[in-house]
Amino acid sequence: MAAYVIADVEVVDSAKFREYGAQVPATVEEYGGKYLVRGGAVEKAEGNWEPNRMVVIEFKSMDQLKKWYHSQEYDGPMQLRHQSANSNVLFVEGV
């Protein structure tokens, strides 16, 4: 079953976040992931959520998603994200 990373990202250091953005796609691809949403316009339909920059990444399974997220390849970029943005990240199983 497919699994998705859903992230709401508030960038606080643009230069470092650009560095993160340049590094992470290769790690996603290495683990079979595919970006479905990467930034772009966000329109809230209802609720109290005030989203920022939205990202959705699809993996073939939750196991593969977690292998990527906890990998050595993603560790460096993840540290850059922690330094350059405030993030809310979910892992969701889908169809």
Where do the language-model regions lie?
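C-terminal structural segments of small proteins and small subunits
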Residues: 62-90
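Short S/T/G/P-rich N-terminal loop/turn motif that feeds into the first structured element of a domain
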Residues: 1-70, 93-95
